[in-house]
Amino acid sequence: MKFRLILSFLLLTTYVVAFSQQKQSEKSHNQKMTATEKGLIKVSVMYPYAQGKHFGMEYYESKHMPMVAGYLGSNLVKYTIEKGLASGVPDQPLPFMAIGTFYVKSLDEYKAAIAPNRDAIREDILKYTDIVPVILVSEVVR
């Protein structure tokens, strides 16, 4: 009986220690992520959902976003691609079919890189969608 009690106590202690270390590791990772992204410029290119419109995710992911990322050069920290799945409100259409986001160090460098390539970017958009994107430029604060 004492052996079972001691064994149970040791297993429980091991579980608690392991769980707390995992939580601490996740917290540390999230703090590092926040610290490295804080102050970056986030350019979100959002494609609103509309009945009858199309969006070619495969082309967007494999051709368009890498093309634009190439224009941004060393100013680009990372980019993400999101595919809309559902609305946050039940029985409502999703607000966006897709969102592409570029994280850059400098807004001025971003503008300088995009300006001479604007026509090529606009022409390429027609290859994967008939949706007019909404663009939001913001600063990551946390």
Across the structure, where does each feature detected by a protein language model lie?
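Bacterial Sec-dependent N-terminal signal peptides
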Residues: M1-S25
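Macromolecular interaction modules
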Residues: S20-R142
